[in-house]
């Protein structure tokens, strides 16, 4: 079947729209689908995503499409950009409509709810082994990407040809640098763990602890990410790149991050529900915390920062209690395996 579009994006939120804008601005005909027909009609009418990226026009090559079957028939390249808790649901909806030559890439950052499984496991369980899979990850704020500000990300997958094609599709000398990576596992994990650490950094700043504490959390958060990555077969070098250190620093230090702002509100004494309501969009780190905590417990990996964030979000703990618990931990060598 011939393509009538170069790529189809599933997910018309802020990040899905930003990636679609970048692709279309790079000269690629791009279809974007969302689960709410009214939202897609608004995109068609306004030629912008006023709900998530107000004031940023959609390029002519970006076509909103409300019908999932039409969107999936248009291209064999499918980019999934939905929250992690609906990732499996969207794949189940898409499966009977996928072309036989479909290739699936996602920019979803997270793990499977309740189980903490990597999204590649979810995808394989739903789709089987016939489709090439890939993941995009790295330090990206949707608003900056959509506005054409310089950005860099990484891509890894199960099929080298697909990975290389994605680099060609996404890379733009003017706006987006794309690095190929061979660590499919590591790129998936980094995008989930960094959200948890960003919440902790936000809580620390909300309490008023300052730059020293924030930097310590980022540094030890990277240790936790690396430790968990090693336990599931990721490459340590991945976490010094875009999907590890890069995404971690961005999300922990800039208030464009919903996860950081969520943590700030918690540190200032607001409860979980109020803090989430103030953000007004999905706070991925809320669910990511439970996912990462579940995975770490299953693998027997020590992750003290993650554990304390989990206690605040799910067990009624407070940010002050979390800080006390971390500071009161037994003295250890920085270079030993346990924290």
Swiss-Prot record:
One of its GO terms (biological process) is glycerol-3-phosphate catabolic process. Catalyzes the reduction of the glycolytic intermediate dihydroxyacetone phosphate (DHAP) to sn-glycerol 3-phosphate (G3P), the key precursor for phospholipid synthesis. Sn-glycerol 3-phosphate binds at residues 109, 138, 140, 194, 247, 257-259. The active site is at 194 (proton acceptor). GO terms for cellular component: cytosol. InterPro entries: 6-PGluconate_DH-like_C_sf, 6PGD_dom2, G3P_DH_NAD-dep, G3P_DH_NAD-dep_C, G3P_DH_NAD-dep_N, NAD(P)-bd_dom_sf. It catalyses: sn-glycerol 3-phosphate + NAD(+) = dihydroxyacetone phosphate + NADH + H(+); sn-glycerol 3-phosphate + NADP(+) = dihydroxyacetone phosphate + NADPH + H(+). Belongs to the NAD-dependent glycerol-3-phosphate dehydrogenase family. Signal peptide: none annotated. The keyword Nucleotide-binding applies. Its EC number is 1.1.1.94. NCBIfam families: PRK00094.1-1, PRK00094.1-2, PRK00094.1-4. Its main location: cytoplasm. This is Glycerol-3-phosphate dehydrogenase [NAD(P)+]. Keywords: Cytoplasm, Lipid biosynthesis, Lipid metabolism, NAD, NADP, Nucleotide-binding, Oxidoreductase, Phospholipid biosynthesis, Phospholipid metabolism. Pathway: Membrane lipid metabolism; glycerophospholipid metabolism. GO terms for molecular function: glycerol-3-phosphate dehydrogenase [NAD(P)+] activity; NAD binding. It is found in: Cytoplasm. NADPH binds at residues 14-15, 35, 109, 142, 258, 282, 284. It comes from Shewanella loihica (strain ATCC BAA-1088 / PV-4).
């Amino acid at each position: 079947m011939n393509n009538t579009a170069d790529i189809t994006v599933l997910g018309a939120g802020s990040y899905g729209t930003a990636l679609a804008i970048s692709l279309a601005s790079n000269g690629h005909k791009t279809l974007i689908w969302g689960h709410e027909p009214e939202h897609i009609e608004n995109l068609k009418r306004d030629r912008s995503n006023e709900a998530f990226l107000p004031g940023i026009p959609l390029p002519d090559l970006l076509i909103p499409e409300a019908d999932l079957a039409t969107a999936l028939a248009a291209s064999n390249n499918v980019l999934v950009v939905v929250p992690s808790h609906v990732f499996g649901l969207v794949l189940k909806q898409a499966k009977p409509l996928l072309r036989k030559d479909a290739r699936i890439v996602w920019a979803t950052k997270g793990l499977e709810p309740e189980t903490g499984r990597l999204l590649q496991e979810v995808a394989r369980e739903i789709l089987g082994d016939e489709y090439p899979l890939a993941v995009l990850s790295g330090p990206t704020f949707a608003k900056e990407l959509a506005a054409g500000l310089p950005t860099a990300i990484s891509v890894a997958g199960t099929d080298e040809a697909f990975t290389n094609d994605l680099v060609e599709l996404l890379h733009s000398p003017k706006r987006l640098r794309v690095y190929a990576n061979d660590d499919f596992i590591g790129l998936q994990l980094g995008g989930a763990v960094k959200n948890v650490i960003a919440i902790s950094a936000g809580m620390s700043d909300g309490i008023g602890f300052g730059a020293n504490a924030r930097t310590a959390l980022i540094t030890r958060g990277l240790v936790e990410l690396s430790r968990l990555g090693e336990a599931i077969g990721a490459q340590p070098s991945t976490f010094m790149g875009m999907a590890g250190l890069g995404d971690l620093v961005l999300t922990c230090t800039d208030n464009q991050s919903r996860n950081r702002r969520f943590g700030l509100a918690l540190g200032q004494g607001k409860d979980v529900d109020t803090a989430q309501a103030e953000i007004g969009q999905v706070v991925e780190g809320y669910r990511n915390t439970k996912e990462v905590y579940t995975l770490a417990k299953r693998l027997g990996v020590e992750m003290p920062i993650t554990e304390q964030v989990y206690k605040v979000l799910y067990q009624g703990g407070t940010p002050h209690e979390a800080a006390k618990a971390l500071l009161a931990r037994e003295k250890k060598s920085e270079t030993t395996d346990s924290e």
